[in-house]
Amino acid sequence: MKISKLLPALLASSVAIVAHAQAPIKIGFMAELSGPQGALGQDQYDAFMMVVEQNGGKLGGVPVEVIREDSQLKPEVATQIVDKLIERDKVPIITGITFSNVMMAVHKKIVDKEVFLIGSNAGPAPIAGAQCSPYSFITSWQNDNQAEVVGVYANDKGYKKVIGMAPNYQAGKDFIAGFKRFRVS
């Protein structure tokens, strides 16, 4: 499904909430907005808000209120923010998570509360597998997919030795696992 259609579809399915409250649906937008990685999170936020503004503060015809939070690329900060968004702000949707280590820290907490999680960048492989939930949607990619293709390519070319390097966090580990999964040697 196209990204531009996913959020409006979710919001349209939440029409009963709006009908009773006649208030905007609150959306928690949590991303890494500060530090060296903050540019990516800020770009995500700017694009998201551009769509909201172009649609007169609505998504799928439903008024929305966006609550912006900075996880600082710290899983422990992100879990505190998620608690606040769910318990105090009562958001039915959280989006914007940029990095896989943050996604892994908050995923279970969000989906166990039956809050929709729309991941716009982070795509940890376990969330598409063992931890898959009908409450989570990743609109970008699954981390190990690209590396699986490279593993197949290395096999097809007959490469005997390959050196792999990746960052030591969830996404990097997913890349290495994906490569190994389709690398026969």
Label each residue range with its predicted role.
Residues 2-20:
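Gram-negative bacterial Sec-dependent N-terminal signal peptides
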Residues 19-29, 57-63, 155-160:
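Immediate post-signal peptide segment of exported/extracytoplasmic ligand-binding proteins
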Residues 24, 39-44, 54, 58-129, ...:
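Beta-alpha junction/loop-to-helix N-cap segments that form part of ligand/metal-binding clefts
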Residues 24-40, 97, 161-165:
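Short beta-strand segments enriched in small/hydrophobic residues
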Residues 38-49, 172-180:
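Short, surface-exposed alpha-helical segments at coil->helix boundaries
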Residues 47-50, 77-81, 146-150:
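Well-ordered alpha-helical segments embedded in enzymatic catalytic cores
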Residues 91-185:
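Extracytoplasmic ligand/sensor domains, especially the bilobed periplasmic-binding protein
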